[in-house]
Regions:
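Catalytic Walker B motif of ABC-type/P-loop ATPase nucleotide-binding domains
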Residues: 164-167
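Conserved signature/switch motifs of ABC ATPase nucleotide-binding domains
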Residues: 138, 159, 191
Length: 246
């Protein structure tokens, strides 16, 4: 778990969005699963399947029910793969006429109805995990802020990501709602989920993070373990920042 802290406007959220290529970095590399995903030649959508993101303001679709929000990405991605496989098989006799090395037919072992059924079962399982199974068929507008953010987190989990990016997941919540979201994130950390978290929750960073980064004016000024970072900060700007927030 990597926690990213810093003053408002320092570039924390921009840094996170660059990791998911929602904003184009101006230089450098972003290596994810051995691939530089900042390379324009790389299909970023393939890698986004393995990188979940949770936003400050939840970003749930208000015109879809809770369970439809959770099912949307898994169904869309798997149906796209199914469509590509069917198209490949349909065109195979023609394309093999012009190839020395013949391609094989793709074995199709699923259907759209099966994909939807499996996604719904997974969504129901995730809702049960956070105690919101009774909210499956309601719309996000009926949920509290804490409930919306927990739904947003399990929506990211529905894709079985390798890493989840959290952009200030508690900053838009009432203080009494913060605990339920942090508890879920702590559970994910205990289960070994890789997380990069932009946060103002210093207690969470101290307790859960393996590494803490301090960003100011778009620069990473200091990194370290929570013990080093909070107990013996070296950068003067970080010392000043911590003196105001702790």
């Amino acid at each position: 778990v990597v926690a990213i802290i810093g003053p408002s406007g320092s570039g924390k959220s921009t840094f996170l969005r660059c990791l998911n290529c929602m904003e184009d970095p101006t230089g450098g590399q972003i290596i994810f699963n051995g691939v530089d995903i900042a390379d324009p030649k790389v299909d970023i959508n393939i890698h986004r399947r393995h990188m979940g993101m949770v936003f400050q303001h939840f970003n749930l679709y208000n015109n879809k029910t809770v369970i439809q929000n959770i099912m949307l990405a898994p169904v869309l991605v798997r149906c796209q793969d199914l469509k590509k496989a069917k198209r490949h098989n349909r065109m195979l006799p023609l394309t093999n006429l012009f190839r020395k090395e013949k391609q094989e037919k793709i074995e199709i072992t699923t259907s759209k109805s099966q994909i939807v059924a499996e996604a719904r079962a997974k969504a129901e399982e995730l809702l049960k995990r956070i105690g919101l199974e009774d909210k499956a068929d309601v719309y996000p507008s009926t949920l509290s802020g804490g409930q919306k953010q927990r739904v947003a987190i399990i929506r990211a989990l529905a894709m079985n990501p390798d890493v989840i990016l959290f952009d200030e997941p508690t900053s838009a919540l009432d203080p009494e709602m913060v605990g339920e979201v942090l508890d879920l994130m702590k559970d994910l950390a205990k289960e070994g989920m890789t997380m990069i978290v932009v946060t103002h929750e210093m207690g969470f960073a101290k307790e859960v993070a393996n590494k803490v980064l301090f960003i100011d004016e778009g620069q990473i000024l200091e990194t370290g373990t929570p013990e080093e970072f909070f107990g013996n900060p070296k950068n003067p700007r970080l010392k000043d920042f911590l003196s105001k927030v702790l």
